[in-house]
Swiss-Prot record:
Disulfide-linked positions: none
Residues carrying N-acetylserine: S2
Subunit text: Component of the Arp2/3 complex composed of ACTR2/ARP2, ACTR3/ARP3, ARPC1B/p41-ARC, ARPC2/p34-ARC, ARPC3/p21-ARC, ARPC4/p20-ARC and ARPC5/p16-ARC.
Pfam families xref list: P16-Arc
Organism of origin: Homo sapiens (Human)
Upper lineage: Eukaryota, Metazoa, Chordata, Craniata, Vertebrata
Subcellular location: Cytoplasm, Cytoskeleton; Cell projection; Nucleus
InterPro entries hit by this protein: ARPC5, ARPC5_sf
Name of the gene this protein is made from: ARPC5
Record keywords: Acetylation, Actin-binding, Cell projection, Cytoplasm, Cytoskeleton, Disease variant, Nucleus, Ubl conjugation
Designated name of the protein: Actin-related protein 2/3 complex subunit 5
Function: Component of the Arp2/3 complex, a multiprotein complex that mediates actin polymerization upon stimulation by nucleation-promoting factor (NPF). The Arp2/3 complex mediates the formation of branched actin networks in the cytoplasm, providing the force for cell motility. In addition to its role in the cytoplasmic cytoskeleton, the Arp2/3 complex also promotes actin polymerization in the nucleus, thereby regulating gene transcription and repair of damaged DNA.
Disease: Immunodeficiency 113 with autoimmunity and autoinflammation: An autosomal recessive immunologic disorder characterized by recurrent and severe infections, early-onset autoimmunity, inflammation, and facial dysmorphism. Features of autoimmunity and autoinflammation include hemolytic anemia, thrombocytopenia, hepatosplenomegaly, leukocytosis, neutrophilia, and elevated acute phase reactants.
Organism superkingdom: Eukaryota
Amino acid sequence: MSKNTVSSARFRKVDVDEYDENKFVDEEDGGDGQAGPDEGEVDSCLRQGNMTAALQAALKNPPINTKSQAVKDRAGSIVLKVLISFKANDIEKAVQSLDKNGVDLLMKYIYKGFESPSDNSSAMLLQWHEKALAAGGVGSIVRVLTARKTV
């Protein structure tokens, strides 16, 4: 009986953690090329008064896969600057111009803005949140709050 167990001990060589999807793997940072949105492009769109293009430029190239908190903070401040510069009447049109992933990304930045409120940012972010919720639904909030990769 023991001879049979010793000879067929292959089951002990299986690494069960290899198949666990929740296993933490400290991989190399794949987002070294992700420097966040281009601040010059965003500023030029803001100066020209093209707010929707400024929002699109600010949401382009998000630093999701980078571990550098400085890059994430810089991208967050750029997006927050764009969101605050919108007029209340233009918010809904801008949110409607985004696709589903864009609305989810916008929600991530809105919640990041809620983390560190400034002078007038909370009131504007609440307006943005209302319009983004109308466009993306409750699922957008759930996807943001359960996402592992943050902005």
